[in-house]
Amino acid sequence: MHTEDTQIANLLIESGIIKDRELQEINLLAKNAGLSFYDAVIDKDIVTDETLGQMMAQSSGYPFVILAKTAIPDELFHLTPEKVARRLKVIAFDRDQTSIKLAMADPNNKEVIEAFAKKTNSKVIPYFATDKDIHNALRMFRKDLQIIVDNLLQEEISKSKVLSADEAPITKIVDVVISYAYDDKASDIHIEPEEKSSLLRFRIDGLLHDVLRLPKILHDRIIARIKVLSRLRTDEHLSAQDGKMNIKTEEENLDIRVSILPVADGEKAVLRLLASKNRQFTLSNLGLCDHDLTKVNKSINKAYGMILSTGPTGSGKTTIIYTILKLINIRERNITTIEDPVEYRIPGANQIQVNPKTNLTFASGLRSILRQDPNVIFVGEIRDNETAGIAVDAALTGHLVLTTLHTNDAATAIPRLIDMKVEPFLVASTVNLIIAQRLVRKICDMCKIPLTVTLSTLAQYFPMEMIKKNLGESLQFTFFKGRGCKICRNTGYSGRIGVFEVLEVTNEIKKLITEKRDAETITKQAVKDGMKTMIEDGLDKIARGVTTLEEVMRVTKVES
């Protein structure tokens, strides 16, 4: 363990928060999920970021500051260039005539302290602040993207230059747009031609937000720049093109998948950001409760059978499969996947890209995989009867098969497989677990406020029995919402989490499958067996202040 990790571990053990066994679990989680020890502690909800920060500050003998609750003068923020502040994880937050207070992730960094003392001609008083708090403070002071781009354009207009795709301003505009999208944890960038302008939008937490409007004359040049970076044809404007690029950020090399499509007013580009720093998921931080975690862990440790992840497009199906694959990825196992596309690389796994031009389909690829001595197989999606049949046969003959289906709930996956000409007895014999999910936006921690909701309001959305079971007997309840702040773009939400229903195929459910009973009957039996429905999991997350009633209703309206 690193020195800081050892310090954190000792603090948690000495304070009685964890025992040696839990320390081993945290170390294993950090290793499997690619998290730092600090982040693994936070992920397991052992302590909050703020509490752990206070403990570390007290242990190291430095005062602790919460920047989110501190009014920082603009002039102090601008003492340090933003890139430097991000790299060093420092921010000045207060000063008087003789001294300056400096929030630092590493207050022992004498070099930084001396540099600030020399620059400001003041005594530097170092404070400890968490990485997350410093990052959010820097975001609060970040210049608006529109202002930055307008300034870049104004500089060139003053030079009376006509801009081409490889001119510095166009290059800088593309770079700064990607940098802002990455920092905002956007999944996609949309660059859309309009009649008189070019509109840029970021998809953040599943929803699109307008972020920038440019003169129409720049649109083609920006598209051309993206084509150059993606190695696409710059002279082709009437056909769709797909490509990819790699951009180096301060934190990682960022893979970006690019789609160019001709539309009415020009060419539209969509850039999918495949950021590994935002993909350090664990089953718990995806939103699975302890009860469901137990069921998932039981199934993924079986040598054979099938695990299905179901839900509409964009509901997080592939994310949970990737997370499971990372957990079971050991050298003694041969993990082989066939995907369309391969979005994220899994070290040690053999990942195959579907290619219809060479007749490499899900079905043909799956047949070939079975001759490669696999232990674990991931099929990106079951789209047809042939793939369904081969996948079930693979699960029946000693392989653990993970795959996805488009269904609204867990139980509906069973009749869907039967509709794909898989015999009911084969479905009953092979399917171990079905995970259905949706993604809800999480309430922003920076602007969370309490909210009173009456029983009569809740009863409009949830069965009374479910309310009493999960919340107890009361006429009103205290939930939470986000007021809206700069960190969350005034939406009240920041980040997403899953709401789940995890259906374990018990002996009773196997019997219902062989009898070809409908999804509703299977769901009722699964609930008897202890399954928490998706809407019930949503209610639990509302009660715990994770998300809001509006969010749960938005994504589970089919069920409600």
Region roles according to the model:
Residues M1-E4, L458-P463, R554-S560:
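Short, charged, intrinsically disordered terminal tails
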Residues L12, V41, L102, F116, ...:
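Residue-level signature of catalytic and energy-coupling elements of molecular machines
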Residues M466-S560:
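NTP-binding/hydrolysis catalytic cores, primarily Walker-type P-loop NTPases
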Residues D5, G34, D49-G53, T70-F77, ...:
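Amphipathic alpha-helical transducer elements in NTP-driven molecular machines
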Residues M1-E114, K119-V124:
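Non-catalytic accessory regions
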Residues L293, N297-I307, T313, T318-I443:
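Switch/coupling sub-region of P-loop NTPases
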Residues Y62, I72-D74, E82-S315, I320, ...:
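N-terminal "pre-motor" subdomain/linker immediately upstream of P-loop NTPase catalytic cores
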Residues T407-T506:
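Cys/His-rich Zn2+-binding cysteine-cluster or related metal-binding knuckle/ribbon modules and their
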